[in-house]
A protein has these predicted regions:
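Mechanotransmission and gating elements of multispan inner-membrane complexes involved in transport
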Residues: 158-165, 210-309
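Short beta-strand boundary microenvironments
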Residues: 164-208
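Hydrophobic, regular-secondary-structure patches
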Residues: 79-169, 188-190, 195, 250, ...
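Hydrophobic alpha-helical transmembrane segments of multi-pass inner-membrane transport and secretion
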Residues: 68-95, 302-338, 361-370, 414, ...
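N-terminal Sec/SRP start-transfer signal
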Residues: 1-15, 37-82
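Short helix-loop junctions at transmembrane helix boundaries
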Residues: 11-35, 369-410, 421, 425-430, ...
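Transmembrane alpha-helical interface segments in multi-pass membrane proteins
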Residues: 329, 337-383, 407-415, 423
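Peri-transmembrane interface segments
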Residues: 4-21, 95, 269-322, 331-333, ...
Length: 439
């Protein structure tokens, strides 16, 4: 009885240590993993045990075509884990990349003091002249400060995918908006005319929502609006529709602005602009760079997607581990006499363990590469939309980066490590005489 409980305790401790080791393995950066791989390669080539491990591994790998059906369970299972994990994380990374690419370090966004987003910010019209006279701002050829008082209105518009109504953002901007937002470029049509109900739509909005083609009219706020142009920015503004701020305010009875975007004279100009605003007691406002502001807007959603992706990947990984364990235990049982023969002619326990581990890791590597390739081919650049902090749809693309593919491979090799270790230990401990008698 005591021996039985001791074995259970040892097994439990082994599982806990293995889980800790697996988590540490997945967290390791490539700068540390490459030296580990190099040391393993040197050990395999230089030492006698390493060369015996390679020789035994070649024997096992040569028999893979004969048991490809069972081996494919490992490859397909791990490919599924890596594919789902990379796809989920690519969604979060793509969303964050879109927000991080919005704005720059020399463009300032001004919000009401304490406001975290435009939705709960109010800037009265009488503050605009005060802000426009602050030092540090860039000016146009006529010496006018480059700033754009803006307000955003959430409107309902039909989705192209299924026709259901979704939230889209109609942004009212000032006449200097095109000089302030330098990433926004007109690609079709013309700019809207101030005072008229005309809109220019972002390329992302055009691809995601119905009725935004050039020349089309749509009803917003019980008024008819005409699409006169299409712009592209490659950032969060691609999801928006732009119009004249005063026209939008009149249509929706908006008496104040929500934000002011201003172009400053580089980073020194921004610092001067921010200091001057803080020093003016009439301006109870917060100012930040547009890059920093938009970058913070997606932090919560990106973290949520990353957590969900990791949890789902971990659950699937457990299934893949059991699949690998089952396959490798079956392989050990089938090759019991072969393994016993190798041990009888001089292959000690360590080369046998390493040979089976190398075999499993090879299958895991194939699964990881397959899963990563599928995720990249299917999801990289795939365009979707989600609800942003302004309660409107933000259009973005999945981004399958080399870092995500590397993480997927680490997960695959970690699953292979766990799935191959215990069968390999069993093979090394199997009595030679018992194994040789098995048919």
């Amino acid at each position: 009885m005591q021996s039985k409980w001791k074995n259970r305790l040892v097994n439990l401790l082994s599982v806990v240590l293995l889980a800790i080791g697996l988590a540490a393995w997945i967290a390791l950066p490539w700068t540390l993993l490459l030296p580990i791989a190099a040391l393993l390669a040197v050990w395999l080539v230089v030492t006698r045990s390493g060369r015996l491990s390679l020789a035994a591994a070649r024997i096992g790998i040569a028999t893979l075509p004969q048991r490809w059906g069972s081996s494919s369970v490992i490859v397909v299972g791990i490919a599924g884990v890596v594919g789902v994990l990379v796809a989920m994380l690519a969604m979060g990374q793509g969303f964050q990349a879109t927000l991080n690419n919005t704005g720059d370090d020399s463009t300032a966004i001004v919000l009401r003091g304490g406001s975290q987003a435009e939705t709960n910010s109010v800037i009265t019209r009488d503050l605009v002249p005060l802000i426009s006279n602050l030092p540090g701002m860039a000016t146009d050829a006529n010496g006018r400060p480059l700033l754009s008082p803006e307000l955003a209105q959430v409107v309902n518009i039909a989705s192209k995918s299924d026709g259901t109504d979704v939230n889209a953002q109609l942004r009212g901007v000032g006449e200097q908006a095109w000089a302030v937002h330098t990433k926004v470029k007109l690609v079709q049509g013309r700019h809207f005319t101030p005072g008229l109900r005309e809109i220019v739509v972002g390329k992302g909005a055009l691809n995601q929502f119905r009725g935004l083609e050039l020349g089309k009219t749509l009803t917003l706020g019980s008024q008819q609006w005409t699409v006169v142009g299409v712009f592209a920015s490659g950032d969060a503004h691609d999801s928006e529709m732009w119009t004249d701020a005063q026209t939008l305010a009149t249509t929706y009875n908006r008496s104040a602005y929500q934000s002011i975007t201003a172009r400053t004279a580089g980073k020194p100009g921004f610092a001067q602009f921010k200091a001057a605003m803080a020093a003016d007691p009439r301006l109870k406002l917060d100012v930040d760079t547009t890059r920093a502001y938009y970058g913070k807007q997606g932090g919560g959603l990106n973290k949520l997607i990353s957590i969900l992706g990791t949890v789902i990947g971990a659950i699937m990984a457990v299934g893949a581990v059991f699949g690998a364990l089952n396959t490798m235990y079956a392989a050990v049982a089938t090759r019991a006499r072969e393994i016993a023969t190798m041990r009888a002619i001089g292959f000690r326990g360590l080369p046998v363990i390493m040979a089976l581990m190398l075999e499993t890791m090879l299958l895991a590597l194939l699964g990881g590469l397959l899963g990563g390739l599928i995720a990249w081919a299917v999801f990289n650049g795939y365009t979707v939309s989600t609800l942003g902090n302004n309660f409107s749809q933000v259009v973005f693309q999945f981004k399958v980066s080399p870092e995500l593919l590397w993480s997927g491979l680490k997960w695959a090799l970690g699953i292979g490590l766990v799935g191959g270790l215990f069968p390999a230990l069993r093979a090394a401990r199997l009595p030679i005489t018992t194994a040789l008698r098995e048919v």
